[in-house]
Amino acid sequence: YNGDWVADSREGKGTFQYVNGDKYVGDWKADVQHGKGIYYFSSGDRYEGDYVEGERTGQGIYVHKNGDKYVGEFKSGEQSGQGTFTWSNGAVYEGQWIDNVRSGKGRYKWANGDEYEGDWKNDMPDGEGVLTMADGTRYKGGFSKGMEEGKGVMLTPEGIRFEGSFKQGKK
């Protein structure tokens, strides 16, 4: 550890190099990470943001070695609250998270241009939502486990409209 000490505790600004190669640079309070800091993982990942009593809690940015990036709220070290995740392939999710899982309201845009906006549960569209395909096909209605389910309306680019029940993504 290189930094400020108060009564044999890390307190203030400092840098700690872990045995596994990880490194933390930032604020300390009562010998734990507390305040603003940057954590460099030996894997190549990086977190920059708020810490509360040694845990990523508050606003932060987590950048993965592969280029994936999350910007938003953290709670107890997990992506929880409002946030945006951008995958290295160009896909983007903006919305609510619970423990690193898309849950609540959100919008996901695939790299191919397809887009879903609505309810999420267990990392999948689940509840009410709108799916707009890159070819212009649009579905508005129920979803379950990532597929069209229940009552809904589908409109094709040619103007064909189907209103009725869907089961596992089929009319």
Tell me what each language-model feature is:
Residues 34, 61-64, 88, 133, ...:
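Short intrinsically disordered, low-complexity segments
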Residues 1-11, 23-34, 46-57, 69-80, ...:
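Conserved anchor residues at repeat-unit boundaries in beta-strand-based tandem repeats, strongest
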